Protein backbone atom coordinates (compact mmCIF):
# COMPACT_ATOMS: atom_id res chain seq x y z
CA UNK A 1 0.00 0.00 0.00
CA UNK A 2 3.04 2.26 0.35
CA UNK A 3 3.80 1.95 -3.37
CA UNK A 4 3.37 5.27 -5.13
CA UNK A 5 1.24 5.12 -8.24
CA UNK A 6 -1.50 7.02 -10.00
CA UNK A 7 -4.44 7.41 -7.66
CA UNK A 8 -7.60 5.71 -8.86
CA UNK A 9 -10.42 8.00 -9.89
CA UNK A 10 -12.79 8.52 -6.99
CA UNK A 11 -16.48 7.85 -7.28
CA UNK A 12 -18.87 10.79 -6.97
CA UNK A 13 -19.89 9.49 -3.52
CA UNK A 14 -16.26 9.32 -2.35
CA UNK A 15 -15.58 12.79 -3.74
CA UNK A 16 -18.59 14.16 -1.89
CA UNK A 17 -17.54 12.51 1.37
CA UNK A 18 -14.00 13.85 1.01
CA UNK A 19 -15.31 17.33 0.29
CA UNK A 20 -17.48 17.25 3.40
CA UNK A 21 -14.79 15.84 5.67
CA UNK A 22 -13.52 18.31 8.29
CA UNK A 23 -9.76 18.51 8.83
CA UNK A 24 -8.81 17.33 12.31
CA UNK A 25 -6.36 20.23 12.59
CA UNK A 26 -9.13 22.83 12.61
CA UNK A 27 -9.14 24.55 15.98
CA UNK A 28 -12.78 25.65 15.79
CA UNK A 29 -15.64 23.52 14.46
CA UNK A 30 -18.13 24.88 11.93
CA UNK A 31 -20.84 27.12 13.37
CA UNK A 32 -24.25 25.63 12.65
CA UNK A 33 -24.96 22.13 11.39
CA UNK A 34 -23.51 21.08 8.04
CA UNK A 35 -23.74 17.63 6.48
CA UNK A 36 -20.45 15.79 6.46
CA UNK A 37 -18.05 13.39 8.14
CA UNK A 38 -16.09 14.81 11.07
CA UNK A 39 -13.11 13.33 12.92
CA UNK A 40 -13.73 13.01 16.65
CA UNK A 41 -11.72 11.67 19.56
CA UNK A 42 -13.23 8.18 19.32
CA UNK A 43 -13.46 7.83 15.54
CA UNK A 44 -15.85 9.58 13.17
CA UNK A 45 -19.10 11.48 13.49
CA UNK A 46 -21.38 11.86 10.49
CA UNK A 47 -24.09 14.49 10.30
CA UNK A 48 -26.92 13.73 7.87
CA UNK A 49 -30.11 15.70 7.09
CA UNK A 50 -33.06 13.61 8.24
CA UNK A 51 -35.00 14.24 5.02
CA UNK A 52 -38.21 15.16 6.83
CA UNK A 53 -37.58 18.46 8.60
CA UNK A 54 -35.87 21.61 7.33
CA UNK A 55 -33.55 21.66 10.35
CA UNK A 56 -33.64 17.96 11.25
CA UNK A 57 -30.33 16.13 11.66
CA UNK A 58 -29.27 12.57 12.31
CA UNK A 59 -25.94 12.03 14.09
CA UNK A 60 -24.04 8.79 13.50
CA UNK A 61 -21.00 7.78 15.54
CA UNK A 62 -18.71 5.33 13.76
CA UNK A 63 -21.59 4.36 11.49
CA UNK A 64 -24.14 3.75 14.26
CA UNK A 65 -27.17 6.02 14.76
CA UNK A 66 -26.65 8.05 17.92
CA UNK A 67 -29.00 11.03 18.05
CA UNK A 68 -31.64 13.01 16.21
CA UNK A 69 -32.13 16.75 16.60
CA UNK A 70 -34.49 19.29 15.08
CA UNK A 71 -32.94 22.72 15.57
CA UNK A 72 -35.42 25.05 17.22
CA UNK A 73 -37.69 22.20 18.38
CA UNK A 74 -36.09 20.66 21.49
CA UNK A 75 -39.28 18.85 22.49
CA UNK A 76 -39.49 16.94 19.22
CA UNK A 77 -37.97 13.51 19.95
CA UNK A 78 -37.76 11.29 16.89
CA UNK A 79 -36.33 8.16 18.55
CA UNK A 80 -39.03 6.07 20.19
CA UNK A 81 -36.92 5.10 23.21
CA UNK A 82 -36.27 8.78 23.93
CA UNK A 83 -40.01 9.44 23.97
CA UNK A 84 -40.37 6.60 26.49
CA UNK A 85 -37.64 8.12 28.66
CA UNK A 86 -39.34 11.51 28.47
CA UNK A 87 -42.70 10.02 29.47
CA UNK A 88 -41.28 8.05 32.40
CA UNK A 89 -39.25 10.96 33.74
CA UNK A 90 -42.06 13.51 33.46
CA UNK A 91 -44.50 11.15 35.19
CA UNK A 92 -42.02 10.47 37.98
CA UNK A 93 -41.21 14.15 38.45
CA UNK A 94 -44.90 14.99 38.71
CA UNK A 95 -45.41 12.41 41.46
CA UNK A 96 -42.16 12.45 43.41
CA UNK A 97 -39.88 15.43 42.68
CA UNK A 98 -39.83 19.22 42.67
CA UNK A 99 -39.87 20.28 39.02
CA UNK A 100 -38.46 23.69 39.94
CA UNK A 101 -35.24 22.25 41.38
CA UNK A 102 -34.41 19.26 39.20
CA UNK A 103 -30.85 18.01 38.91
CA UNK A 104 -30.66 15.70 35.90
CA UNK A 105 -27.52 13.84 34.85
CA UNK A 106 -27.15 12.30 31.40
CA UNK A 107 -24.47 9.61 31.03
CA UNK A 108 -23.74 9.64 27.32
CA UNK A 109 -24.17 12.84 25.38
CA UNK A 110 -24.32 12.39 21.62
CA UNK A 111 -26.19 15.42 20.33
CA UNK A 112 -27.63 16.16 23.81
CA UNK A 113 -31.17 15.46 22.59
CA UNK A 114 -32.53 14.54 26.03
CA UNK A 115 -30.71 17.38 27.79
CA UNK A 116 -32.19 19.88 25.31
CA UNK A 117 -35.62 18.36 25.88
CA UNK A 118 -35.56 18.54 29.67
CA UNK A 119 -33.93 21.98 29.74
CA UNK A 120 -36.86 23.24 27.68
CA UNK A 121 -39.51 21.29 29.60
CA UNK A 122 -38.12 22.31 32.99
CA UNK A 123 -36.50 25.75 32.46
CA UNK A 124 -35.03 25.89 35.97
CA UNK A 125 -33.55 22.39 35.82
CA UNK A 126 -29.80 21.78 35.82
CA UNK A 127 -28.70 19.19 33.26
CA UNK A 128 -25.21 17.70 33.38
CA UNK A 129 -24.15 15.70 30.32
CA UNK A 130 -21.20 13.31 30.68
CA UNK A 131 -19.63 12.71 27.26
CA UNK A 132 -16.51 10.64 26.64
CA UNK A 133 -15.58 12.32 23.37
CA UNK A 134 -14.20 15.83 23.84
CA UNK A 135 -14.23 16.69 20.14
CA UNK A 136 -17.83 15.54 19.75
CA UNK A 137 -18.84 17.70 22.72
CA UNK A 138 -17.20 20.67 21.01
CA UNK A 139 -18.97 19.99 17.73
CA UNK A 140 -22.49 19.57 19.10
CA UNK A 141 -22.21 22.85 20.98
CA UNK A 142 -21.45 24.53 17.64
CA UNK A 143 -24.01 22.60 15.58
CA UNK A 144 -27.11 22.68 17.72
CA UNK A 145 -29.13 24.99 19.98
CA UNK A 146 -27.99 23.50 23.29
CA UNK A 147 -28.66 25.82 26.25
CA UNK A 148 -25.58 27.13 28.00
CA UNK A 149 -24.44 26.06 31.46
CA UNK A 150 -25.80 25.79 34.07
CA UNK A 151 -28.98 24.72 32.22
CA UNK A 152 -26.94 22.23 30.17
CA UNK A 153 -23.35 21.58 31.20
CA UNK A 154 -21.24 19.13 29.18
CA UNK A 155 -18.59 17.38 31.26
CA UNK A 156 -16.00 15.39 29.30
CA UNK A 157 -15.07 12.07 30.88
CA UNK A 158 -15.74 8.34 31.09
CA UNK A 159 -19.19 7.71 32.53
CA UNK A 160 -18.14 5.21 35.20
CA UNK A 161 -15.24 7.29 36.48
CA UNK A 162 -17.30 10.47 36.57
CA UNK A 163 -20.22 8.78 38.33
CA UNK A 164 -17.83 7.60 41.04
CA UNK A 165 -17.11 11.26 41.86
CA UNK A 166 -20.74 12.23 42.45
CA UNK A 167 -21.61 13.28 45.99
CA UNK A 168 -24.27 11.20 47.75
CA UNK A 169 -27.87 12.33 47.10
CA UNK A 170 -26.72 14.93 44.56
CA UNK A 171 -28.90 13.85 41.59
CA UNK A 172 -32.67 13.69 41.14
CA UNK A 173 -32.67 11.85 37.81
CA UNK A 174 -29.81 9.91 36.21
CA UNK A 175 -30.17 8.73 32.62
CA UNK A 176 -27.70 6.20 31.21
CA UNK A 177 -27.50 6.16 27.43
CA UNK A 178 -23.93 5.04 26.79
CA UNK A 179 -22.85 2.85 23.89
CA UNK A 180 -19.63 1.64 22.30
CA UNK A 181 -20.94 0.73 18.87
CA UNK A 182 -24.32 -0.87 19.56
CA UNK A 183 -23.45 -2.20 23.04
CA UNK A 184 -23.30 -0.59 26.48
CA UNK A 185 -19.85 -1.05 28.06
CA UNK A 186 -20.02 -3.93 30.53
CA UNK A 187 -18.57 -1.83 33.36
CA UNK A 188 -21.74 0.30 33.29
CA UNK A 189 -24.06 -2.70 33.71
CA UNK A 190 -22.70 -4.25 36.90
CA UNK A 191 -24.19 -4.38 40.39
CA UNK A 192 -21.24 -2.31 41.64
CA UNK A 193 -21.91 0.48 39.15
CA UNK A 194 -25.63 0.35 39.92
CA UNK A 195 -24.88 0.82 43.62
CA UNK A 196 -22.74 3.85 42.80
CA UNK A 197 -25.65 5.30 40.83
CA UNK A 198 -28.09 4.61 43.68
CA UNK A 199 -25.84 6.38 46.19
CA UNK A 200 -25.78 9.49 44.00
CA UNK A 201 -29.59 9.73 43.87
CA UNK A 202 -31.53 11.93 46.26
CA UNK A 203 -34.63 10.54 48.02
CA UNK A 204 -37.30 9.94 45.40
CA UNK A 205 -34.64 9.88 42.69
CA UNK A 206 -34.94 7.96 39.42
CA UNK A 207 -32.38 5.92 37.46
CA UNK A 208 -33.44 5.23 33.89
CA UNK A 209 -31.26 3.43 31.36
CA UNK A 210 -31.38 2.63 27.67
CA UNK A 211 -30.58 -1.02 27.02
CA UNK A 212 -30.13 -2.12 23.41
CA UNK A 213 -30.61 -5.87 23.05
CA UNK A 214 -31.38 -8.73 20.69
CA UNK A 215 -34.41 -11.05 20.57
CA UNK A 216 -33.04 -13.32 23.32
CA UNK A 217 -33.03 -10.34 25.73
CA UNK A 218 -29.84 -11.66 27.33
CA UNK A 219 -28.53 -8.21 28.15
CA UNK A 220 -31.88 -6.90 29.39
CA UNK A 221 -32.32 -9.87 31.74
CA UNK A 222 -28.82 -9.42 33.15
CA UNK A 223 -29.36 -5.69 33.64
CA UNK A 224 -32.72 -6.26 35.34
CA UNK A 225 -31.07 -8.73 37.70
CA UNK A 226 -28.38 -6.19 38.62
CA UNK A 227 -30.98 -3.47 39.17
CA UNK A 228 -33.06 -5.71 41.45
CA UNK A 229 -29.99 -6.25 43.62
CA UNK A 230 -29.96 -2.53 44.39
CA UNK A 231 -33.39 -0.98 43.81
CA UNK A 232 -36.70 -1.95 45.36
CA UNK A 233 -38.76 -0.98 42.30
CA UNK A 234 -37.70 -1.88 38.75
CA UNK A 235 -39.75 -1.50 35.57
CA UNK A 236 -38.96 -2.48 31.96
CA UNK A 237 -40.46 -0.49 29.08
CA UNK A 238 -40.41 -1.84 25.51
CA UNK A 239 -42.81 -2.60 22.70
CA UNK A 240 -44.53 -5.97 22.74
CA UNK A 241 -42.63 -7.35 19.73
CA UNK A 242 -39.31 -6.92 21.49
CA UNK A 243 -40.54 -8.34 24.79
CA UNK A 244 -41.82 -11.37 22.88
CA UNK A 245 -38.36 -11.91 21.39
CA UNK A 246 -39.31 -11.10 17.81
CA UNK A 247 -36.74 -8.40 17.08
CA UNK A 248 -33.85 -6.32 18.33
CA UNK A 249 -34.65 -3.02 19.99
CA UNK A 250 -34.30 -0.71 22.98
Sequence positions of predicted segments:
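Rossmann-like AdoMet
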Residues: 1-95, 117-121
